[in-house]
Curated annotation (Swiss-Prot):
<dbReference type="InterPro" id="IPR015421">
    <property type="entry name" value="PyrdxlP-dep_Trfase_major"/>
</dbReference>
<dbReference type="InterPro" id="IPR015424">
    <property type="entry name" value="PyrdxlP-dep_Trfase"/>
</dbReference>
<protein>
    <recommendedName>
        <fullName>Serine hydroxymethyltransferase</fullName>
        <ecNumber>2.1.2.1</ecNumber>
    </recommendedName>
</protein>
<dbReference type="GO" id="GO:0030170">
    <property type="term" value="F:pyridoxal phosphate binding"/>
</dbReference>
<dbReference type="InterPro" id="IPR019798">
    <property type="entry name" value="Ser_HO-MeTrfase_PLP_BS"/>
</dbReference>
<keyword id="KW-0963">Cytoplasm</keyword>
<comment type="pathway">
    <text>One-carbon metabolism; tetrahydrofolate interconversion.</text>
</comment>
<dbReference type="GO" id="GO:0019264">
    <property type="term" value="P:glycine biosynthetic process from serine"/>
</dbReference>
<keyword id="KW-0663">Pyridoxal phosphate</keyword>
<dbReference type="InterPro" id="IPR015422">
    <property type="entry name" value="PyrdxlP-dep_Trfase_small"/>
</dbReference>
<dbReference type="GO" id="GO:0035999">
    <property type="term" value="P:tetrahydrofolate interconversion"/>
</dbReference>
<feature type="binding site">
    <location>
        <begin position="125"/>
        <end position="127"/>
    </location>
    <ligand>
        <name>(6S)-5,6,7,8-tetrahydrofolate</name>
    </ligand>
</feature>
<comment type="subunit">
    <text>Homodimer.</text>
</comment>
<dbReference type="InterPro" id="IPR001085">
    <property type="entry name" value="Ser_HO-MeTrfase"/>
</dbReference>
<feature type="site" description="Plays an important role in substrate specificity">
    <location>
        <position position="228"/>
    </location>
</feature>
<dbReference type="InterPro" id="IPR039429">
    <property type="entry name" value="SHMT-like_dom"/>
</dbReference>
<keyword id="KW-0554">One-carbon metabolism</keyword>
């Protein structure tokens, strides 16, 4: 039998030490990676339960193993809460990631070689929307749309491509696009050209749930998402769909691309969906958008350009060329100042993908720890201070001290 007193710190001190260092890093640094957030203690607790011991191939009420009566309750809670949160007709909570959620939809409705429209990775899309290095781009005939001359999603291009190529599926959604996407218009283009319509809201899901970003569920045949990022849940994926597609999607996930579901993670998803249904989460989503607006405006005042001119969401792409610094260099030097960002290509970027001319910033994590407009403005100024003098160690140290004061005042997890 196991002794509950033999906790991780006693069983594996080396691993525990690394985890403690990561905890310190998360507490001390301002986290601005748009795809990252902090999960609640309840979400993390769910992932550490005995549910990790249970195999449960199949779906609630239709399992291939015995002893699933309680994991059925867990998974059904997650399904019902997800449907309530977004107004979906049907939902699958088993995908282990957003990428697998997308793959599940593709497997459900496409055959190898079918034509699909997706947003170009170089202009803000995602790997799984047809990038040549990804399985989606290898298995299917993806055609890419992008941005117009104002760096706004080019709906006219989508319409022209759809008319010319008559795709089986049109995919909307992005990993680095700051503005609202007109899902109703995209759905109309799909219908007029005989295509199914899928939306990947991995980045925007928390804002959609909080009423701060358009909800694609009424317009799309399929909506996929991750459950971390702006939803603040565990790392995982989900698929929402019209009822007529439920059987095909469920079969594509299991047995199509996955085996036994991770019920401990599904439990954590259920917790996150309950949290997202609360009035407090709507306040959180609203603050995320307010903070992003202030952060973007502050950076513009300090001489930096925001791709698309502004943000209407949680995320923004910052063009660094005016400062004479690459995204790779900016990521490194801001990291020294305890500000965590990721390098990111800008549209028509002249630099290589591992270098880039931009950085991507997001406000979900900073907002979770309690940052409001004043802290967002200060953060923007601290970023600009570093980028204006990236090789001045004294300047970096001064910014780091201000960051440490700010993060110590607003911890992620209170000590109480």
């Amino acid at each position: 039998m196991f002794d509950r007193k033999l906790t991780l710190d006693k069983v594996d001190p080396d691993l525990w030490a690394a985890i403690q260092k990561e905890d310190e890093r998360q507490e001390q640094h301002i986290e601005l990676i748009a795809s990252e957030n902090y999960a609640s203690p309840a979400v993390m607790q769910a992932q550490g339960t005995q549910l990790t011991n249970k195999y449960a191939e199949g779906y609630p009420g239709k399992r291939y193993y015995g002893g699933c009566e309680y994991v059925d309750i867990v998974e059904q809670l997650a399904i019902d809460r997800l449907k309530e949160l977004f107004g979906a007709e049907a939902a699958n909570v088993q995908p282990n990631s957003g990428s697998q959620a997308n793959q599940g939809v593709y497997m459900a409705v496409l055959k190898p070689g079918d034509t699909v429209l997706g947003m170009s990775l170089a202009e803000g899309g995602h790997l799984t929307h047809g990038a040549s290095v990804n399985a989606s781009g290898k298995l299917y005939n993806f055609l890419s749309y992008g941005l117009d001359e104002n760096e706004v999603l080019n709906y006219a291009q989508v319409e022209a491509l759809a008319r010319e190529h008559k795709p089986k599926l049109i995919v909307a959604g992005a990993s680095a696009y700051a503005l609202h996407i007109d899902f109703e218009r995209m759905a109309r283009i799909a219908r007029e050209n005989g295509a199914l319509f899928m939306v990947d809201i991995a980045h925007y899901a928390g804002l959609v749930a909080g009423g701060q970003y358009p909800n694609p569920v009424p317009h799309a045949d399929f909506v996929t998402s991750t459950t971390h990022k702006s939803l603040r849940g565990p790392r995982g994926g989900v698929i929402m769909m019209k009822a007529q597609h439920e059987k095909a999607v469920n079969s594509a996930i299991f047995p199509g691309i996955q085996g036994g579901p991770l019920e401990h993670v599904i439990a954590a998803k259920a917790v996150a969906f309950k949290e997202a249904l609360s009035p407090e989460f709507k306040d959180y989503a609203s603050q995320v958008v307010k903070n992003a607006k202030v952060l973007a405006e502050t950076l513009v005042k300090r001489g930096l350009r925001i791709v698309s001119g502004r943000t209407e969401s949680h995320v923004m792409l910052v063009d660094l060329r005016a400062k004479g610094i690459t995204g790779k260099e900016a990521e490194a030097v801001l990291g020294k100042a305890h500000i965590t960002v990721n390098k990111n290509a800008i549209p028509n970027d002249p630099e290589k993908p591992f270098v880039t001319s931009g950085i991507r910033l997001g406000t979900p994590a900073m907002t979770t720890r309690g940052f409001k407009e004043a802290e967002a403005e200060l953060t923007g100024n601290l970023i600009a201070d570093v980028l204006e003098n990236p090789h001045d160690e004294a300047n970096i140290a001064a910014v780091r001290a201000k960051v440490n004061e700010l993060t110590s005042r607003l911890p992620v997890y209170s000590a109480k």
